[in-house]
């Protein structure tokens, strides 16, 4: 199964190392090289002094497909893109790393003794998945410039949708980075302080050891001197050696007690400095938390203001949207009203056109029907009469004309009321004139029928009826003449009617042409209206489309703003809740910390008072010790010089020691030889001691006598001193008198006499006291 690969590439500001290709089949340890594990190209062990042995762990999680890095309680820390994973000597949670991240192990450390700077490991990491593809880059992750620690191997990738929140996170990260740098500086200062304390302790220990060595050398020198003396008594030699050893033990115990006292004082001063530092750190943390609280409150206020601004913008946009919707509705209503008006006009024109067409069709149908009736009547009359049909034709034509005229008058009635009245008057006149002819025609038809009946019934009476027929013919001729006259009159009337009909036709034609022109103009208007309606509809459609697009845009923008507002609300609520929780936690922590700190403060105050008193005393002692230290430094300098001299003396002493050892060998032989002599001498010495004892008793008696003499001389001396004082007083009085008067020439002689008497009195006493 293929495994994931991590490549560590050295950067210019790093401690130099070869490029490492590490396969992450299992969690890989990153650390300092030791005897068991040496640096190689396939491991993460580096030859660098600032790394810990078990500095960090790196591994690949097959479930999530992500790479993780964990700091394992390293002393100098692990950094991803200049962000420390944990505080000093604390284990960090697993943190996701991406390809292209800058990984730093440890920090640069400078040695004060040799002034050498040890560099840290800074590398660019490239990560490859088991399938050979490179892992995600940091630039591909949106708004996640720095990795964040995860709990239980789950990447906590922040999802930021706002530039302000991103800047806020950047500011927080920069503040954390500055805090980490300050912590590192404090750690380095603490380390330097510890180093200086260790250096002072070592220097003090060296001073004490050197003093011990000097005292030991002095003791050895004294012992050497004691041994080099040709003493005859071993007891005196042993006693001197014991006294020197006692002196050395006393000095060592005194110096040890002094060192212990100084160490206790230094420990107290160190504890005091630690307490002061912890107090200053807690105060700094309190001020930092207060500043963070104020900053977060200001940021929340800014977010609230921005949210209110966004809400106001949303309200303005909603108002604009409502105004646009109102305008669109007005435009739609206007378009609908115009469309309805145009449609109504079109419908009216179409109805008028249909009515005119219906009227024309009705007139045409009536005309056809009347023509059919007239043709039928003509045929019937022709079949019945078979005679002169001119009158009938004229009558039919007249009837046709009358029918046409009636139809035309009907049309004129519908079009114009005035012409309708005239047409009705003319029709009434025509009906009056045609009524006798109609009656006669009806009588003729009845006579024809009667004739047919007579012809059918009585053919025999033909001859009789011929005479009657002739008479009737005469009468009929008369009637025909009368009817011809009437026809002429009717023809004249018909001509007049023709003229009127022609005029009416012309008027009708004019009206028809005018109506047709009106229809054409109406059609043109309808077309124009259709075109205008289409244009208006197209414009309205375009306006509606543009308005709909704008409406969609506005709605989309409104929806976006609403989503943004909802997201802002969610973020604000989450931030408020988290901030409230954080504030509550901070308040609880601050309360607990405050109570704890108050208790500690009270303790510290008590300790401070105690320590202050001790500090004053220690300061005084420190001044004394500093002066003593300066003196001892001077002595140390002198002792160093003396030590150099003593080293030379030691070499000489070693030479002399060798010689003395040789001499001791010879002395032992002499001692063995002299032991017998010493025994003899010892017996002699015992005898001499007895003699000395006797002499001692004698001297004791002499001493008692001398003491008595001394007391007597002391009394004499006291009396002489009193006399001398009196003489001095008298001399002063005499000098004062001499200053007032002329000096006496015998005064020096008197002073010399007094001095001589004092000497005479004082010297014998001394001579007696001296034996």
UniProtKB/Swiss-Prot annotation:
Membrane-side (Cytoplasmic) residue stretches: 1-745
Coiled coil: 167-202, 230-381, 452-742
Transmembrane segments: 746-766
Annotated stretches, region: Disordered: 420-450
UniProt keyword annotations, A-Z: Cell membrane, Coiled coil, Cytoplasm, Cytoskeleton, Endoplasmic reticulum, Membrane, Mitochondrion, Phosphoprotein, Transmembrane, Transmembrane helix
Membrane topology: Single-pass type IV membrane protein
Cystine connections: none
Pfam families: FHA
Statement: the UniProt record of this protein carries the keyword Cell wall biogenesis/degradation: no
GO MF annotation list: protein-macromolecule adaptor activity
Region (Necessary for targeting to centrosomes): 1-163
Domain FHA: 28-85
An annotated GO cellular component: centrosome
Biased composition range(s): Basic and acidic residues: 420-429
Annotated localization: Cell membrane, Sarcolemma; Cytoplasm, Myofibril, Sarcomere, M line; Cytoplasm, Myofibril, Sarcomere, Z line; Cytoplasm, Cytoskeleton, Microtubule organizing center, Centrosome
N-terminal signal peptide: none
Listed GO biological process terms: negative regulation of hippo signaling; protein localization to plasma membrane; regulation of membrane depolarization during cardiac muscle cell action potential
SUPFAM superfamilies reported in the protein's UniProt record: SMAD/FHA domain
Entry's family note: Belongs to the SLMAP family.
Record remark on domains: Alternative spliced transmembrane domains determine subcellular targeting. Isoforms 1, 2, 3 and 4 are targeted to endoplasmic reticulum membrane as well as mitochondrion membrane. Isoform 5 is not targeted to mitochondrion membrane but to endoplasmic reticulum membrane.
PANTHER family assigned: CENTROSOMAL PROTEIN OF 170 KDA (PTHR15715), SARCOLEMMAL MEMBRANE-ASSOCIATED PROTEIN (PTHR15715:SF22)
Record note on quaternary structure: Homodimer. Interacts with myosin. Interacts with SIKE1 and both associate with the STRIPAK core complex composed of PP2A catalytic and scaffolding subunits, the striatins (PP2A regulatory subunits), the striatin-associated proteins MOB4, STRIP1 and STRIP2, PDCD10 and members of the STE20 kinases, such as STK24 and STK26. Interacts (via FHA domain) with STK3 (when phosphorylated); the interaction associates STK3 with the STRIPAK complex.
Role summary: Associates with the striatin-interacting phosphatase and kinase (STRIPAK) core complex, forming the extended (SIKE1:SLMAP)STRIPAK complex. The (SIKE1:SLMAP)STRIPAK complex dephosphorylates STK3 leading to the inhibition of Hippo signaling and the control of cell growth. May play a role during myoblast fusion.
Protein name: Sarcolemmal membrane-associated protein
